[in-house]
Amino acid sequence: MKKSVSPVQSNNEMPIPDGMTVFNTEDVDTNKQHMFFGKPLGVQRYDKYKYPVFDKLTQQQLGYFWRPEEVSLQKDRSDYQTLTDQQKHIFTSNLKYQILLDSVQGRGPGMAFIPYVSLPELESAMLVWEFMEMIHSRSYTYIIKNVYSDPSDVFDKILDDDKIIARAESVTKAYNNLINAAQNWGTSNLYKEGHKETYTSSYELKELKRLLYRAIVNVNILEGIRFYVSFACSFAFGELKLMEGSAKIISLISRDESQHLTLTQQILKRWQEGDDPTMVDIANEERENVLDMFRNCVDEEKDWADYLFSGGSMIGLNAKLLHRYVEFIANRRLRALGFDPLYDVPLRNNPLPWTEHWLNSKGQQNAPQETEIESYVVGGIKQDVKKNSFAGFKL
């Protein structure tokens, strides 16, 4: 963060305020900064990066830009009228849960992470991340307005659902702990004291970074596990040729969430590799807590599956299968972070293999006149062509 300096340095220099600033006039080499809690950013420049992977993720997210209105839901409205009460319960409950998750993600990164980011490429990736989450929330509204005769029947009942509220507490706790602690730190003398090498200031900043670490892990779990029971249910309807437009939209959302999962994985990986020595210590100290976070999430998602299928199964899907699927997904996410699997499900034995083509939209081949093409990438040009790139080609 920025050192405390005199408000006015000279008649020819802009004042540099204490604390956070929207534009830092100090010359800062961002390649030498940690990802978080460094000096505030100044010029938004995207020509050199400490971690190019974050710029690649920005480009990928921008290339995948889409709008829900591109997908027709005309058939979904009539399909919904043919669903059984149990199927309607599954479809509507999952929509409510997805609305909760993306309402959190639609503002969470901007409130908790972006104010303390110290690298322009990471700031950029997170800004696009938050924007895409807004697209997701608008997508749920688009589905609800087209499928239900009265959208208020869904929206107004979200906060009345005890199962949803129970999810909200576990999803938002780590976010709220970080946001409140960071705000207190930023508005008190702790912000200035953080630049002094004293035990108190170092301890306070380390504990704040610990909350940041937990929040990033929490989001990794949210993006990587919490969506997947509802994803599987949406895709199951699509497999039955029901609610296909909604399934297509959820497939687009899942593609974006995969990018956001990768973003959190890359942040955690950089910490493990020593981006911030304090974070290396914190990562080692938090290993058992991370495992507990994964266990709690898996247990909650199993409970959610039980709730969804409390009235019976649907063709190709039931609560027991979803239990195994959640364990399978959790093992994969743990392995990506360098942890051993927690559950007795082989990493290559997907209990719901038919979900793969929905999660990997690039693998779908659709005739343009039949359905919306979702594998199209906007601005997908290769820009690293060198002088000798075509040396072996002849006309």
Question: What residue spans do the PLM features occupy?
Answer:
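Non-heme di-metal
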Residues: 2-395
